[in-house]
Amino acid sequence: MKQRFGKVAVLFGGSSAERDVSLMSGAAVLAALQGAGVDAHAFDPAERDLHILKEEGYDRVFIALHGRGGEDGTVQGALELMGIPYTGSGVMASALAMDKWRTKMVWLSCGLPTPRYAILDADSDFDAIARDLGLPIFVKPVHEGSSMGATKVTEAGQLRAAWELAARYDSLVIAEEFISGQELTAPFLDDRALPLVRIVAPDGNYDYQHKYFTDDTRYDCPCGLPQAEEEALQALILKSARVLGCRGWGRADLILTPEGRPYLLEMNTSPGMTGHSLVPMSARVAGMSFEALCLAILAGARLG
């Protein structure tokens, strides 16, 4: 295994708002790779400069960073310049998928379904936006993940406060219409869609706390959909990743209405790999252990 992969750096931690989640993801990945006999080492970009990777002779990188500075194309660009292969999507797709607004623009231009939205700023007519999108409305930073800075607005008078909260995290804030239905997530590995996971939060609010620090959210995998319907959604997910230029692995979130209509929400190019994370759960149902999943992701490390 050491000869196959060489010296591997697992990048985790970083300085984004999702640092704590990344620390959990990276520790799990590192333990799995080392357990499989890979010469893997921890590397926190918040504590060490990236150029050290080249100086210390690393052969490839497993990116377990989340949020800005980790899955937005910046680290990927640095690794491209150093000529060190890395896991996941390349520079362009990473930057694009991190931007919820432009991701939606691409999806819509390709005829893919996604909820209606508006970009908010200090001069927005919040009452008009509430009337146009209807209530409830989800408000979130354009460039954050893990529901950081996100709010579910149930009254028009709450919209400005929700924008102010999201604006603490990002200069760009998006308001998205609420779509009622099943919340699903769909991981993919290379050109293969993994089993869908249905997410059932006890209060219907799958926020940061529910994602990583509580056990009261129910995850159904298999998701319970008829095979033909699940396969159609998996095909949609693969197309949604392809039009963004994603590669390697990732996870898309979507809503399925009671009428059976899907709406794409977000694309994650460096999903969580914690004990609560959904990609390992889906892979397990597909017959892959966590160790096998990490090795498969690492095997896909590349440049370009």
From Swiss-Prot:
Is ATP-binding there in the keyword field?
yes
HAMAP family per the record?
Dala_Dala_lig
What's any GO biological process attached to this entry? peptidoglycan biosynthetic process
**Record has Kinase as a keyword:** no
Naturally occurring in which organism (per UniProt): Azoarcus sp. (strain BH72)
Q: What is this protein called?
A: D-alanine--D-alanine ligase
Looking up Pfam families in the UniProt record yields: Dala_Dala_lig_C, Dala_Dala_lig_N
Binding, Mg(2+) 2: 266, 268
> What InterPro entries does its record include?
ATP-grasp, ATP_grasp_subdomain_1, D-Ala_lig_Van_CS, D_ala_D_ala, Dala_Dala_lig_C, Dala_Dala_lig_N, PreATP-grasp_dom_sf
